[in-house]
A protein has these predicted regions:
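Cysteine-nucleophile active-site neighborhood
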Residues: 60-125
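Structural motif
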Residues: 55-57, 88, 136, 169-171
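N-terminal beta1-alpha1 cap of cysteine-dependent amidohydrolase-like domains
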Residues: 1-70, 79, 180-184, 188-193
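Pocket-forming structural segment of enzyme catalytic cores
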Residues: 100-160
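C-terminal and late-domain segments of enzyme folds
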Residues: 1-8, 141-193
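Beta-strand-turn-beta hairpins that frame and shape the catalytic cleft
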Residues: 12-14, 129-132, 162-168
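Cofactor-binding loop segments of dinucleotide-utilizing enzymes, especially the Rossmann-like FAD-
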Residues: 21, 92, 172
C-alpha cells in the first residue's frame, strides 16, 4: 500500500483537476483517487469549473504549452491559480508555472537541467524537514527564486521544490512513487479552506 493511502476518505472529499493535455496525468489521477478525491481531467477551460485544486503534471513542457495555447487554457489557468485554490506543479508543471511561461510562480526554471533521459535518477530528499523519495526524469531545477518563494528541497545545491502562496512546484515526479504526501498536501489545503 502506498504511504499516505489507507486512511479512510473523508465523508465529503474534494474535486481535484489534473491538466490532461499530455504527460503523467493518469498516474496523478490514480494517486488522488486512492486518497478519496473526485478527479476530473482538464482539457478545456470549462473543465476547470467547480474544481477545488489542480495538478499540472510532468510531461514535455513545449507540448503541454502548445496544448494550453491551442485549447485557450492560458488565461483560465492563470485565473484559477490567482483565485488562491491549491495548485501542484510537477516537473513540466513547474516549468509551465514559472516566469517565462504562465508567469504565476516567481521563479526561473532551467529545463532538463539534470540531463537527458539516461541521466534520470532517484534520491531521498529532506523535503521541508520531511523525508521524501523523489524520481527525477529529464528534470528541471530552479535557477532564480523570487523573494516570496520558499525553497523546500534542493539537490546538488539547486532548488527542486518551492512553494509560493497556494502553489507547490517540484522538479520531480511524486506520482511515480508509493509516497502520497504531495497529493495529500492538495487535499489538506482544500480541507483547510
Amino acid at each position: 500500500m502506498r504511504e499516505g493511502a489507507g486512511v479512510p476518505a473523508p465523508e465529503r472529499c474534494c474535486s481535484i483537476g489534473v491538466l490532461a493535455l499530455q504527460g503523467g496525468f493518469e498516474a496523478h489521477a490514480k494517486a488522488l483517487r486512492e486518497l478519496g478525491a473526485d478527479v476530473r481531467e482538464v482539457r478545456t477551460p470549462d473543465d476547470l469549473d467547480g474544481l477545488e485544486a489542480l495538478v499540472i503534471p510532468g510531461g514535455e513542457s513545449t507540448t503541454i504549452g502548445l496544448g494550453v495555447e491551442r485549447e485557450g487554457l492560458a488565461e483560465p489557468l492563470a485565473d484559477f491559480v490567482r483565485s488562491g485554490r491549491p495548485v501542484l506543479g510537477t516537473c513540466a508543471g513547474m516549468i509551465m508555472l514559472d516566469r517565462d511561461h504562465l508567469g504565476l510562480l516567481d521563479v526561473s526554471v532551467r529545463r532538463n537541467a539534470f540531463g537527458r533521459q539516461l541521466a534520470s535518477f532517484e534520491v531521498d530528499l529532506d523535503f521541508d524537514g520531511v523525508p521524501l523519495h523523489a524520481v527525477f526524469i529529464r528534470a528541471p531545477w530552479v535557477e532564480d527564486v523570487g523573494t516570496d518563494v520558499e525553497v523546500l528541497a534542493e539537490v546538488e545545491g539547486h532548488p527542486v521544490a518551492v512553494r509560493q502562496g497556494n502553489i507547490l512546484a517540484v522538479a520531480f515526479h511524486p506520482e511515480l512513487t508509493d509516497d502520497l504526501k504531495l497529493h495529500q498536501w492538495l487535499l489538506d489545503r482544500v480541507s483547510a479552506a
